[in-house]
Amino acid sequence: MTNADPHELQKFSDLAHRWWDPNAEFKPLHELNPVRLKWIDSHAHLTGKRVLDIGCGGGILSESMATLGADVKGIDLSNEALGVADLHSLESGVTVNYEEIAAETLAAREPASFDVATCMEMLEHVPDPSKVVEACKTLVKPGGWVFFSTLNRNVKSYLFAVIGAEYVARMLPKGTHDYARFIRPSELAGFARAAGLLTADIKGITYNPLTRDFGLSSDTDVNYMLACRREA
């Protein structure tokens, strides 16, 4: 299997049936989604664009981008998650084309086919994130947008994203994240640059546990998002 960790895949496959429950394990994704969607749309203007959502899981971001008028394809390597995504798409009436395929495989099959690629909360779960970044560049057209989100690697992110979120607040199941796979912004920007992507914007994500609100910030110490463009 290309650039995939079977343990990571199984972890999310086991939770697939809970993906669209806004009060279950994926509650943080439901709460975060409006913030990341607005930020992506502010750069890429999604209406009418062909969009690829890499590591789409149950389709939370995929469906919301389609609702804005994008032609969305979602890919993942968890058959269980894709089954949930397909079923929810039928129930909601929001059209998304889902496929079980690796980004690298799709890049070889359909290079320069998308206006936008999103790869959110996924890079920290694969053995070689640089290969996914390279595939993202190949998949978008010249001038196309690529969006990433992941977790910084430092003491603060370990305390907040692992100890705080998984063990204290129990926002996430224990073992959701492997700290060793967290990626510093400089490392991700380096992967992007090596692939031929130009960094256009970086934003940190903040969380208020009292209001349960996510927001954008210049603080990239924990969660952050990176917007890139393929050179025209």
From Swiss-Prot:
InterPro entries: SAM-dependent_MTases_sf, UbiG_MeTrfase. One of its GO terms (molecular function) is 3-demethylubiquinol 3-O-methyltransferase activity. The keyword Repeat does not apply. The lineage of its organism: Bacteria, Pseudomonadati, Pseudomonadota, Betaproteobacteria, Burkholderiales. It comes from the Bacteria. Keywords: Methyltransferase, S-adenosyl-L-methionine, Transferase, Ubiquinone biosynthesis. Belongs to the methyltransferase superfamily. UbiG/COQ3 family. The keyword Cell membrane does not apply. This is Ubiquinone biosynthesis O-methyltransferase. It holds the Pfam family Methyltransf_23.
